[in-house]
Curated annotation (Swiss-Prot):
Name this protein carries in UniProt: Photosystem II protein D1 2
Species the sequence originates in: Synechococcus sp. (strain RCC307)
Note on how the cofactor is bound: The D1/D2 heterodimer binds P680, chlorophylls that are the primary electron donor of PSII, and subsequent electron acceptors. It shares a non-heme iron and each subunit binds pheophytin, quinone, additional chlorophylls, carotenoids and lipids. D1 provides most of the ligands for the Mn4-Ca-O5 cluster of the oxygen-evolving complex (OEC). There is also a Cl(-1) ion associated with D1 and D2, which is required for oxygen evolution. The PSII complex binds additional chlorophylls, carotenoids and specific lipids.
Lineage, uppermost ranks: Bacteria, Bacillati, Cyanobacteriota, Cyanophyceae, Synechococcales
Entry function: Photosystem II (PSII) is a light-driven water:plastoquinone oxidoreductase that uses light energy to abstract electrons from H(2)O, generating O(2) and a proton gradient subsequently used for ATP formation. It consists of a core antenna complex that captures photons, and an electron transfer chain that converts photonic excitation into a charge separation. The D1/D2 (PsbA/PsbD) reaction center heterodimer binds P680, the primary electron donor of PSII as well as several subsequent electron acceptors.
InterPro entries linked to this entry: D1/D2 (IPR055266), Photo_II_D1/D2_sf (IPR036854), Photo_RC_L/M (IPR000484), Photo_RC_L/M_CS (IPR055265), PSII_D1 (IPR005867)
Any further remark recorded for this protein: Cyanobacteria usually contain more than 2 copies of the psbA gene.
């Protein structure tokens, strides 16, 4: 009887597979990382070059280029990678689709390159979170929580331009450009009066409040393991089995500060709540922007409230309406003649009948 002995030599591909999926590496790569790393590198390199040296972009498609780079007079606050031209619309616009490199730059090609590689990269990062959790035997909720900011990036860079019909409506990649996007979004969609945005505000601000409350309660109820002359941080050893703070004391304090049932007596349910509150809020905001992308806008109160004598009762809705009209008038000043919201009178026919002769 003969036995076959397999050679101990491992192929290069097997070595690569073992390295990619090895959880003992200082930084886990994973199969999603194989996609993530080149995409994020491409997006980052192109973004830096464009922010420094990209020529002006004809964002509105009316031959009035907008400069966004350092070399054309911007600083870190005003600079941005300008979205691709309205003349391109929703067309996929890689470098090889343009006749020349100058044309590609003039029409805002770098914006699409950065955004598409960035979205693929951050999506792969979420997959990598799941992959590492799976290999370590952990539960998958880390990538679920990360899906909230991922969805926010998806809606402002992809879904909103799709709904509006052009990547020129996407969010510029810069500080002032982001603020401009927010103001124009409010002017055109009244996002402040959208219930999903309100839930998102509650999620973000509430999450900040709960995080501060939790951190301060834990810090205030640490189990003392050190002397008065030492920092309390030295009382914790990484991996120790004992609780580092007294949850009973924290529970008792908070229950007396507000009322008993406002305080969690289960550490697991407490931390789930701390994670779920902001995540659900950001998901709602993303859904709100996705609906407004297709012009299902926030509540509008275009008609002022009148009293019995027909006089206007001033409300904050009136202030918001005037602010929206002002922002709409100011943005893209040369792209359209007059905002339709301000055209309150009926249009008169110009040449529907022939003039009388003789």
């Amino acid at each position: 009887m003969s036995t076959a002995v397999r050679s101990g030599r491992v192929s290069s591909w097997e070595s690569f597979c073992q390295w990619v999926t090895n959880t003992d590496n200082r930084i886990y790569v994973g199969w999603f990382g194989v996609l993530m790393i080149p995409c994020l590198l491409a997006a980052t390199i192109c973004y830096i070059i464009a922010f420094i040296a990209a020529p002006p972009v004809d964002i509105d498609g009316i031959r009035e280029p907008v400069a966004g780079s350092f070399l054309y007079g911007n600083n870190i606050i005003s600079g941005a990678v300008i979205p691709s031209s309205n003349a391109i619309g929703l067309h996929f616009y890689p470098i090889w689709e343009a006749a020349t490199l100058d044309e590609w730059l003039y029409n805002g090609g770098p914006y699409q390159l950065v955004v598409f590689h960035f979205l693929i990269g951050i999506s792969a990062y979420m997959g990598r979170q799941w992959e590492l959790s799976y290999r370590l035997g952990m539960r998958p909720w880390i990538c679920v929580a990360y899906a909230a900011p991922l969805s926010a990036a998806m809606v402002v860079f992809l879904i909103y331009p799709f709904g509006q019909g052009s990547f020129s409506d996407g969010m510029p990649l810069g500080i002032s450009g982001t603020f401009n996007f927010m103001l124009v979004f409010q002017a055109e969609h009244n996002i402040l009066m959208h219930p999903f945005h309100m839930l998102g505000v509650a999620g973000v601000f509430g999450g900040s409040l709960f995080s501060a409350m939790h951190g301060s309660l834990v810090t205030s109820s640490l189990v003392r393991e050190t002397t008065e002359s030492e920092s309390q941080n030295y009382g914790y050893k990484f991996g120790q089995e004992e609780e580092t703070y007294n949850i009973v004391a924290a529970h008792g304090y908070f229950g007396r500060l507000i009322f008993q049932y406002a305080s969690f007596n289960n550490s697991r349910s407490l931390h789930f709540f701390l994670a779920a509150w902001p995540v659900v809020g950001i998901w709602f905001t993303s859904m709100g922007i996705a609906t407004m992308a297709f012009n299902l806008n926030g509540f509008n109160f275009n008609q002022s409230i009148l009293d019995a004598q027909g006089k206007v009762v001033p409300t904050w809705a009136d202030v918001l309406n005037r602010a929206n009209l002002g922002m709409e008038v100011m943005h893209e000043r040369n792209a359209h003649n007059f905002p339709l919201d301000l055209a309150t009178t009926e249009s008169a026919p110009v040449a529907l009948q022939a003039p009388a002769v003789g």
